[in-house]
């Protein structure tokens, strides 16, 4: 660069892409199972954990799930069984939602990919002081700036329980079975907005 000339444009090609997307994503998947029993009763249980990094930096998905089931022969003709299962998952949503209606779902995900991949190389993603520049808006601006200013996460929790019995009325011929179950689900959306300077 000639120090006697004014620099009008600078090449920032690829910077926005590198600030937005991961080159590699890490995934974990763990599973544990236990089971056993005797002539009186049986049981089985499992526990799982799954974690996956998103393609976009600062996004990921996590899930924990488990089950437990058991049966026990109270009398020679009566067996009871019970069990339960649960699932918990959490993932952050992108910051590209409508600022006036943050609960209405995603409205600008395609802008994030389109703008990031097609941004002209002379666009500077940095302010003069070295901080990330906001760009045009949260939907098509600088993801590196907006990812910490607008945060939203979705959490799901699902739980089920069951209990039942089997009564042998006539040996090997007639049985009376009864079962009942309960299912509970909880959905939570968290949204926060930090100070924005543009």
Language model: regions and residue ranges:
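Surface-exposed loop/interface segments of Gram-negative outer-membrane beta-barrel transport/assembly proteins
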Residues: 1-13, 24, 54-59, 65, ...
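N-terminal periplasmic accessory domains that precede
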Residues: 9, 30-32
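Outer-membrane beta-barrel channels and translocator barrels
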Residues: 27, 38-39, 73-77, 170-172
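Residues on the lipid-exposed face of transmembrane beta-strands in outer-membrane beta-barrel proteins
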Residues: 32-38, 66-72, 161-169
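Ligand-site clamp/hinge motif
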Residues: 50-52
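C-terminal beta-signal and adjacent terminal beta-strands/loops
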Residues: 19-21
